[in-house]
């Protein structure tokens, strides 16, 4: 019996595939975030005129989705393999199908459907035209053309492909629980992540200090605005990410009402809009160096 591809090999295969397509292989960004899109390697780089092609694995924390390690498919933290290409290649969909083939999934032998699912992240001022990708009845990826990021129109067109690492691995390894997945060298996903899942869920739902988190949000927000006033875009963006994660912890704990929730999201959105404009202004001051690099390469 042929050994099924483990997660480690799956990630290495995707890295090799997208690296060969011209993507820089970035590393996960070291601030908590709810999705790979929120990494500065996507959020900031999607705006402005400069080209950008990158691929990376991003651990994504969603406190409200924690299930104490007892649910086979819902997790406090999951992993996304993120691909962002700007400008978007005309044959990006073909690239995606070829990437599945590289993982041993022949598109001609499987039911692969692109189901319309336009994307929106209101708290970060983002929207796009998108599709869920279903593989034999299971959603394994999200495919998006960004229209607006940080309240700014995206030009040139930027495409994003997000692979759900655990979901795709579950399909490839044919297991019903993510905790039974082989990460690599015989070590199971549950051996690494089951205990953290339980502890983070307990923290998010039961023991997080709400008063402290409320103070943290206010402090992070104040610092983000201060840094933007000083023209320090990247440190400011880190604090916006911290605001977002702190809000998600408060939301999971039930510490914010429906009305308050809208208010917090509005506060994050205002910062996201500001930092997006500041990033483009900063790159313009530098003469949009990646545009010059593209011209030199051509």
Curated annotation (Swiss-Prot):
It is found in: Cytoplasm. Keywords: Aminoacyl-tRNA synthetase, ATP-binding, Cytoplasm, Ligase, Nucleotide-binding, Protein biosynthesis. Transmembrane segments: none annotated. It holds the Pfam family tRNA-synt_2e. It catalyses: tRNA(Gly) + glycine + ATP = glycyl-tRNA(Gly) + AMP + diphosphate. One of its GO terms (cellular component) is cytosol. This is Glycine--tRNA ligase alpha subunit.
